[in-house]
Amino acid sequence: RFACLIDRFGVRLIVNPDYAVKNNLCSLRRVEKYLANTYIVPCDIWCGKNPFSSHELYSWYMVSEQADEAGMVRANRKGELVRVPRGQSGNAMPGIAYLLKDDCDVLRTRMEQLCENPESHGFFWEAALFDGAKMIVNARLVPAGEVIEINTYEQLRQRDSASPQLESDKLNVIAAVLGAGTGDI
């Protein structure tokens, strides 16, 4: 599904066959030798503005101004990302980050420690960013709605009805079988 990225951008795809049982902490561990001055970007994110820069001065983890019950952190006045108590909302965490080499070295060590413990296999990779109650990287705060997680076709259609991802042969077949237009799916 992502093979087009190889020819178009020269990326190297690495597959985690254990993803169904080990989540993305173990996926990131599979590419740890490539981590240095690196963006980490989930594949289910929609960005209203390009989040990348040719020069990043510091490591950061992107959070939205939007409150989210699933958010584990909040950005404080110093730009630090601090853990929120259970039951409280934090900032929405779309999952995009940039890590300088030194922070990647720390991340590698923490991922190794976490992945040795089978209880950690279901963790998200962000667990390795924590040092006690705060993350080792600062916040990159973006306005609510600028970066969102897309989990369904309907969410993508609501956010970006002109997206080329909404047009596919599969959708045309589904529409034909159901006797509906693709906009009705």
Label for each model-derived stretch:
Residues 7-11, 33-38, 53-60, 133-136:
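Short glycine/proline-enriched coil/turn segments at helix->beta-strand junctions
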Residues 1-38, 117-119, 180:
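Conserved N-terminal catalytic core of the sugar/cofactor nucleotidyltransferase
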Residues 2-3, 24, 28, 48-50, ...:
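Short, well-ordered alpha-helical microsegments
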Residues 92-183:
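Conserved alpha/beta core of the MobA/IspD/sugar-nucleotide pyrophosphorylase nucleotidyltransferase superfamily
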Residues 19-23, 68-70, 145-148:
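A short acidic, often aromatic-flanked loop/helix-cap motif at beta-alpha or helix-coil junctions
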Residues 37-46:
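Short beta-strand-to-loop acidic/aromatic patch adjacent to the donor-nucleotide binding site
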Residues 48-120:
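Conserved core of the sugar-phosphate nucleotidyltransferase
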Residues 26-34, 77, 154-158:
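Short, surface-exposed amphipathic charged segments that create phosphate/polyanion-binding patches used
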